[in-house]
A protein has these predicted regions:
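Intrinsically disordered, low-complexity RNA-binding regions enriched in Gly/Arg/Ser/Tyr
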Residues: 1-23, 28-40, 44, 48-84
Length: 84
């Protein structure tokens, strides 16, 4: 399951997401989205884990404080490929 996390502190790293979500199950992937030009965080990211564990994590973490900000945690949506 793909989990979308928004309103992240701009200093949050991939390792921070892993530490936050690992209490809910095995993580198969994590990434912070960064600006292509500046390489600065855009304040959101994704975590991959099983559907059962992901639903537990969403229920437990959505609306909680992490590094000074209230985070939003939800099921991630698949994006349509960009047209060439």
């Amino acid at each position: 399951m793909n989990i979308f996390i928004s309103n992240l502190n701009f200093r949050v790293r991939k390792e921070d997401l892993i530490a936050l979500f690992q209490n809910y199950g095995e993580i198969t992937g994590a990434r912070i989205i960064v600006d292509k030009e500046t390489r600065r965080s855009k304040g959101y990211g994704f975590v991959e884990m099983s559907e059962e564990d992901g639903m537990k994590a969403i229920a437990a973490l959505n609306g909680t404080e992490h590094q000074g900000r209230i985070i939003n945690v939800a099921v991630g949506q698949e994006r349509e490929p960009k047209a060439l």
